[in-house]
Amino acid sequence: MRQARARVVQVRPERTLEALYLDPLQARVRANGGRVFAGGPEFHLLIDFKTEAEPTWQVLQAVLERYAGMLTTFSADRVETNAVTVVMSGNSPRAAVASLPVRRAAIDGRKGDLEGSASPRLVAWVSENWRELFHWRGEGEFTEAERTKLRTFVDQAHAQGRRIRFWGGPDVESIWREQRAAGVDFINTDRLADLRRFLLATP
């Protein structure tokens, strides 16, 4: 008999999407006049699918409907922006989502979507691995060729009504600075306090 490892996963009932995210967000929206931050812009909640796409979407769809009053609504011809905009990443069920006339979430696409036909009302974001597109790791010179490539990528997405995010890159200020200058919409980081200081200090 071969040796094997089994991993037992315990799901704690208090650690649900509702308890950790949606309920606290809803409380803030109610307390702040219809916004997560009083007087602030829409808030984005990125949900990364790690399990089978369609069954997960069926469960998530039912959950989101209970919070419809604070969520952005997407349809074939319009987006009704609300306090919280949900975007699904990872193994998301694009065909199932696209088949719905009205939905409470959009999809986080990839660079191929910039050349495809998917509506920005379905694929609202485009996210890519920084290391697959750029050689620069935040040290030394960011070449003009790569800087132009970055800005062209961002401009193309914005022209289509999509927002841009990069993941997998070095989590350093030099990368943040170039992304911010190029108009990248969402800067990925695990250094929240440092990024906050950087953004507040950068015009």
Question: Which stretches of residues belong to each language-model region?
Answer:
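Catalytic cores of phosphodiester-bond hydrolases, prominently lipid phosphodiesterases
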Residues: 2-203
